[in-house]
C-alpha cells in the first residue's frame, strides 16, 4: 500500500507541476458556471415557468432559486465527469514520454501502477470539483438559497460518487491511449457530448419518448437526477411549505428530471444511489481486467 500511495503522490505532484494542465483544470468550472448562467439560465427558467399554472403566483426569489439549483446541479453533474479526463493525463503522458518503460522493468506490479493513476485521478478531481462546488454555493447564495446543512452534505456525497464514476470511466477509456493528442480528442468529445446525454444541458423530459427510453439505460441519467434531487430538495420543501398544489410540484419535479422513469416505474433516490454504486463497481472491475491486458507502450 505504501508503494501505491507513493505512486499516487508522484502523479499528483506531476499534475501540480504541469501549470498548463493545472490551470486548465481549475479554470474549467469557472468557465462552465459563466456559460451556464449566461446561456442556459433562461432555458431553465422558461422550462420551469411552463409547468406553473397561470392562477398561481411564485415569487421571483423562488423561481431564481429553482433555476440556480437546477443550473448548479447540471454543472456539477458534468464537471465531476469531464474533469477526470483532464486530470488523468499523467497515465497517457507516461506512455508518450517513455516513463512507463522504466516502470515496466521495476519490481512494482502493473496493478499497483494503475491503481496509483486511478487514486491520483480521484484525488485531483475531488480538489477541482470542490472549487466548482464552492462557486456553485456562492451562485446559489446570490440567486436564492434554500439548502440546509443536510442537503449540502448529500450533494458532497453525490459529488464523490460522480467523481468515482468518472474516474473509473476515464481510466478505462484512457488505458489504450498513447499520445496526448488522442486524450485531448477524447476529452473534447466527452466534454461536448456528455452534457446532452446526461440531461444537463436540456432536461431529458424534453426529449422524445424513444430517446428517453434509451437514456434510461445509462447510469449518467441517474447521476444527474441524483444531484438534482438533493440540490432542489430545499426548493421543493419551500413549495410544500407555501401549500402549492401537489400536482404542480410533481409536474415541476418531472420537468426537471427529478423523477426519472425506467420501464414505467419512477426511480427513487435510494435506487439512484444503488445504480451509481453498482456502476462504479462494474467499471472498477472492468478497469482491473483491462489493466491485465498488454497495451503496447504501457503493458507488462
Indicate residue ranges for each PLM-predicted region.
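Perimembrane loop-to-helix junctions flanking transmembrane segments
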Residues: 47-63
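Hydrophobic alpha-helical transmembrane segments of multi-pass membrane transport proteins
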Residues: 31, 64-142
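Aromatic- and glycine-rich beta-strand/loop motifs that create alpha-glucan
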Residues: 1-32, 97, 112, 297-299
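Alpha-helical transmembrane segments and their short interhelical loops
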Residues: 110, 118-198
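Transmembrane helix segments
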Residues: 34-44, 174-235
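Hydrophobic alpha-helical transmembrane segments of multi-pass membrane transport/permease proteins
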Residues: 14-48, 67-85, 126-129, 187-195, ...
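Short amphipathic alpha-helical coupling elements at transmembrane boundaries
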Residues: 6, 10-14, 97, 101-105, ...
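Junction motif at the cytosolic side of a transmembrane helix
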Residues: 242-300
Amino acid at each position: 500500500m505504501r508503494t501505491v500511495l507513493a505512486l499516487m503522490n508522484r502523479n499528483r505532484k506531476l499534475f501540480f507541476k504541469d501549470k498548463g494542465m493545472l490551470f486548465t483544470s481549475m479554470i474549467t468550472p469557472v468557465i462552465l458556471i459563466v456559460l451556464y448562467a449566461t446561456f442556459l439560465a433562461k432555458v431553465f427558467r422558461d422550462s420551469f415557468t411552463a409547468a406553473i399554472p397561470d392562477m398561481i403566483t411564485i415569487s421571483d426569489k423562488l423561481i431564481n432559486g429553482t433555476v440556480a439549483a437546477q443550473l448548479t446541479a447540471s454543472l456539477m453533474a458534468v464537471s465531476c465527469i469531464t474533469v477526470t479526463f483532464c486530470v488523468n493525463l499523467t497515465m497517457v503522458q507516461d506512455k508518450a514520454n517513455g516513463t512507463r518503460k522504466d516502470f515496466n522493468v521495476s519490481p512494482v506490479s502493473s496493478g499497483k501502477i494503475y491503481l496509483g493513476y486511478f487514486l491520483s485521478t480521484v484525488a485531483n478531481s475531488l480538489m477541482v470539483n470542490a472549487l466548482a462546488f464552492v462557486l456553485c454555493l456562492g451562485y446559489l447564495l446570490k440567486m436564492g438559497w434554500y439548502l440546509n446543512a443536510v442537503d449540502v452534505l448529500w450533494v458532497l456525497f453525490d459529488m464523490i460518487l460522480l467523481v468515482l464514476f468518472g474516474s473509473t470511466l476515464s481510466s478505462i477509456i484512457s488505458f489504450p491511449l498513447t499520445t496526448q493528442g488522442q486524450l485531448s480528442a477524447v476529452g473534447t468529445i466527452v466534454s461536448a457530448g456528455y452534457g446532452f446525454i446526461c440531461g444537463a444541458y436540456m432536461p431529458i423530459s424534453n426529449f422524445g419518448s424513444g430517446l428517453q427510453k434509451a437514456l434510461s439505460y445509462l447510469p449518467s441519467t441517474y447521476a444527474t437526477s441524483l444531484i438534482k434531487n438533493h440540490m432542489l430538495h430545499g426548493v421543493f420543501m419551500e413549495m410544500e411549505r407555501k401549500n402549492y398544489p401537489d400536482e404542480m410540484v410533481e409536474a415541476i419535479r418531472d420537468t426537471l428530471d427529478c423523477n426519472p422513469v425506467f420501464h414505467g416505474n419512477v426511480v427513487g433516490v435510494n435506487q439512484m444511489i444503488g445504480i451509481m454504486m453498482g456502476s462504479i463497481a462494474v467499471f472498477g472491475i472492468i478497469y482491473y481486467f483491462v489493466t491485465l491486458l498488454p497495451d503496447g507502450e504501457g503493458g507488462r
